[in-house]
Amino acid sequence: MKQSKMLIPTLREMPSDAQVISHALLMRAGYVRQVSAGIYAYLPLANRVLEKLKNIMREEFDEIGAVELLAPSLLTADLWRESGRYDTYGEDLYKLKNRDNSDFILGPTHEETMTSLVRDEITSYKKLPLNVYQIAPKFRDEKRPRYGLLRGREFLMKDGYSYHADQDSLDETYNDYKKAYEKIFERAGLNFKPIIADAGAMGGKDSQEFIAITDDRINLEKWLVLSKNITSIEEIPESVLSEIKEELGKWLIAGEDTIVYAEGGDYAANIEMASSQFEPNVAYTEELELEKVATPGAKTIDEVSKFLEIDEEQTVKTLVYHADDELVVVLLNGNDQLNEVKLTNYLGASFIEAASEAEVEEKFGAHFGSLGPIGLENVKIIADRKVEQIKNAVVGANVDGFHYKNANFGRDYEVEEFVDLRTVNEGEISPDGRGTLKFARGIEIGHIFKLGTRYTEAMNANILDANGRSIPMLMGCYGIGVSRLLSAILEQFARIYVEKTPREEFKFSWSINFPKELAPFDIHLVPVNVKDEAAMELTSELEEKLRGKGYQVLVDDRNERAGVKFADSDLIGLPVRVTIGKKAAEGVVEVKIRATGEVVEINKDELVNTIEILSK
């Protein structure tokens, strides 16, 4: 492929509006262009990478018996009314009307559409399981699209759906998808973790996310590729390393997910679902007499603890939430934070919201800083399981400026149930006891769900089972953010190339270091002077030879300065660059391996073998 025939509009500088390195490099290297806020055009290079990702997915899904189809993006609202999501999905849903004033949506996901297709065609358990998927655009009206392809209004997604007559069949397909996802992300070269996740608005029971880790900003060696005349990172002057660290610090760590994993163990979960080992305290502590004390001006846990000269561990804080139409009081250890997802899941609520200060004062006669569980009536009280173990606790007295000392569950107040409601902290023990918990940031690149009958029951997607009974099909759904994957790959494979000039000066620049299986082309042939007849003849000869060996080759046939060509080649990030320069008449070329920075000068007859050896 001739570079002059392709649309690769590289930029000399990073775009000023980019906040994460993946967005900046995709724009600067000419992979994408923004058409509107949150909407991007995938230019030829990006499209080639996406096609390679799609083909990897197709190969792995073929292995598990998943069949590809293509559903429309413009969907009737009637199906979403059947499932109940038309009015509950929220403002992210694109709603529109046709000329007949009928309601339609642009699909953010396709559970309803697929279920309607299946219910019209399958009526017996004998035709199940069915496992289908598509790779197609999705739409969400993001209030604040940002971070390039990571949070857009239109995005490319692989969404799969499976239908089953029994739980064993659903479990088997769910596990097949988990293994297929792991193979896909491994082939993409990603550092990722499968984690326990919340099903959220999708509904259903079991759920697992796949997160690409993005928060490594400390390990400089991971980011740097050194030129052949730099032997180690220690050779780089401290002033240059400081500049590199400053450059790294300009870019936000991509990914809005915090994951929790066990260092030295297998446990991993989203922060919303993570728990730690809970060991009941069996030691006996004498219950002291309840005492009401003045705490003037002390409204926070920190202020109360300091005023009473106690540890925060000895306090219980009281929170108030609306859960659908019910008011709920939640008790936590004073130095813990409430995990709202755990609270939502425990209550089975579709909506929770913290009560306002005014509501609390009207209902309980005190502000939050003095609120406590003693004397509360006609309200549900639930507590984190740690609260049960706090003997002689300090709690609010439901009178502003006062607290109780020595409050004890069972004697002074009651709790409907003790459950895990807190957000875990780093350094705690994994729930399985194997390893301590660590936090990391990452990008969600895949998500699988066991939806059960969440959609099939609502939409009357029933079959006759082996006994002739009409039952709703069981359902699973399985998503991969394909365009997100492109950003995740760049977040992990962006590199800073450091070179030492003949004048012993150190320079550095950003480069993309695509994994071999995903690079838009395998090899970049760069003739330095397109007016040099010998160089162009050798370029054509090498292109033909390399293509004959199965390599995908991009030839920079532009009449540009050598510096421009090399800068663009570094930005584009193909695994191998072959430079045809002044020694073309002698049949000598220069080979540069992107991943290692290694550069060798070889005879043209050694090119294929050299590339195979150096690329391993």
Curated annotation (Swiss-Prot):
Enzyme Commission code(s) on record: 6.1.1.15
Pfam families, sorted:
HGTP_anticodon (PF03129), tRNA-synt_2b (PF00587), tRNA_edit (PF04073)
Give the matching InterPro entries: aa-tRNA-synt_IIb, aa-tRNA-synth_II, aa-tRNA-synth_II/BPL/LPL, Anticodon-bd, Anticodon-bd_dom_sf, Pro-tRNA-ligase_IIa, Pro-tRNA-synth_IIa_bac-type, Pro-tRNA-Synthase_IIa_type1
Q: Give the catalysed reaction(s), semicolon-separated.
A: tRNA(Pro) + L-proline + ATP = L-prolyl-tRNA(Pro) + AMP + diphosphate
Q: Where in the cell is it found?
A: Cytoplasm
- List the cysteine pairs that form cystine: none
Question: What is the top-level taxon of the source organism?
Answer: Bacteria
Per UniProt, the keywords (alphabetical) are: Aminoacyl-tRNA synthetase, ATP-binding, Cytoplasm, Ligase, Nucleotide-binding, Protein biosynthesis
Question: What is the first-listed, main subcellular location in coarse terms?
Answer: cytoplasm
Report the leader peptide range.
none
- Gene Ontology CC annotation, any one: cytosol
Query: Per the UniProt entry, what are the Gene Ontology biological process annotations, in alphabetical order?
Result: prolyl-tRNA aminoacylation
Per the similarity annotation, which family is this?
A: Belongs to the class-II aminoacyl-tRNA synthetase family. ProS type 1 subfamily.
UniProt cross-references to PANTHER family, sorted A to Z: MITOCHONDRIAL RIBOSOME PROTEIN L39/PROLYL-TRNA LIGASE FAMILY MEMBER (PTHR42753), PROLINE--TRNA LIGASE (PTHR42753:SF2)
- Purpose: Catalyzes the attachment of proline to tRNA(Pro) in a two-step reaction: proline is first activated by ATP to form Pro-AMP and then transferred to the acceptor end of tRNA(Pro). As ProRS can inadvertently accommodate and process non-cognate amino acids such as alanine and cysteine, to avoid such errors it has two additional distinct editing activities against alanine. One activity is designated as 'pretransfer' editing and involves the tRNA(Pro)-independent hydrolysis of activated Ala-AMP.
* Domain notes for this protein: Consists of three domains: the N-terminal catalytic domain, the editing domain and the C-terminal anticodon-binding domain.
Subunit and interaction comment: Homodimer.
Q: What is the protein's given name?
A: Proline--tRNA ligase
Q: What is the lineage of its organism?
A: Bacteria, Bacillati, Bacillota, Bacilli, Lactobacillales
